[in-house]
Amino acid sequence: MLLLWALLALGCLRCGWTVNLQPQLASVTFATNNPTLTTVALEKPLCMFDSSEPLSGSYEVYLYAMVDSAMSRNVSVQDSAGVPLSTTFRQTQGGRSGPYKAAAFDLTPCGDLPSLDAVGDVTQASEILNAYLVRVGNNGTCFWDPNFQGLCNPPLTAATEYRFKYVLVNMSTGLVQDQTLWSDPIWTNRPIPYSAIDTWPGRRSGGMIVITSILGSLPFFLLVGFAGAIILSFVDMGSSDGEMTHDSQITQEAVPKTLGTSEPSYSSVNRGPPLDRAEVFSSKLQD
């Protein structure tokens, strides 16, 4: 049903006059959380500028953004010669002093749009979203990168009212061919104060409480286990030293030494009789 509604909305865009059209927020079918604190997703002007007849030549669509003010509905995005403005986010203080060019993309012909029936296909979802949507404020690094050369689309300011406008530019002449009206004011989300965040455990489920308790006590058990491992290692080292000392004492006692003589004692060598006894024994044999 939502896909049929989206197709019907695109068909209605073809029936309307270009001067009466405004940029619109993306449908919840494509962007569920929109706007965010720093981004706004808009529907691209599909079948808007070429609704009456196909365009011949090379065209691009420029998207301009500015902070809402009393005069923002009448602000022009081109000079007196019809050349579109090239002002940047930095030059306009984030759109507060005037409109800046937030995005630029090729104009896709109506007949070349991807089918919305495949929006549920994960492999084609990114392509379809890029074809139908443009997101303002999705580049968080270009503003702080001094070497960035492309079109910078920095994050928007939270809780701020913005307006947007599409401009069709003929790339052959570099002049504005057509443009939409400024959009209605669109607010970015407001950050939730810390005091408003509900931290009462009574509103949490039983599973959340159990998981939180386990995670909270896990460091204590790890610390106890680590301390026990250190103590056991010291105990094992002490018992090993005692055994080595006992063995060395037994070895020393097993090798006695004769007092009053300098002859070394070898416990493992079978020594013969003394020299005087050997001489007596040999004399008896001769007799």
UniProtKB/Swiss-Prot annotation:
Please list the GO biological process terms of this entry.
Answer: cell morphogenesis; epithelial cell differentiation; kidney development; potassium ion homeostasis; sodium ion homeostasis; urea transport; urinary bladder development; water transport
Q: What does the organism's lineage look like at the top?
A: Eukaryota, Metazoa, Chordata, Craniata, Vertebrata
- Cited PANTHER family: UROPLAKIN III, UROPLAKIN-3A
Where does it live in the cell? Endoplasmic reticulum membrane
Outline which residue ranges sit on the Lumenal face.
19-207
The protein here is known as Uroplakin-3a
The protein's assembly and partners: Heterodimer with uroplakin-1B (UPK1B).
**Keyword Ribonucleoprotein in annotation:** no
Write out the ranges of the annotated region (Disordered): 243-287
Give the signal peptide, or none: 1-18
Cellular compartments per GO CC: apical plasma membrane; apical plasma membrane urothelial plaque; endoplasmic reticulum membrane
- Cytoplasmic side of membrane: 236-287
Keyword terms:
Endoplasmic reticulum, Glycoprotein, Membrane, Signal, Transmembrane, Transmembrane helix
Q: Which intervals carry biased composition (Polar residues)?
A: 259-270
User: Any transmembrane segments, and where?
Assistant: 208-235
| Protein's UniProt keywords contain Glycoprotein | yes
Q: How does it sit in the membrane?
A: Single-pass type I membrane protein
Family of this protein: Belongs to the uroplakin-3 family.
Question: Can you tell me which residues are glycosylated?
Answer: 74, 139, 170
Q: Which InterPro entries match?
A: Uroplakin-3 (IPR024831), Uroplakin-3a (IPR024825)
Q: What is the role of the protein in this entry?
A: Component of the asymmetric unit membrane (AUM); a highly specialized biomembrane elaborated by terminally differentiated urothelial cells. May play an important role in AUM-cytoskeleton interaction in terminally differentiated urothelial cells. It also contributes to the formation of urothelial glycocalyx which may play an important role in preventing bacterial adherence.
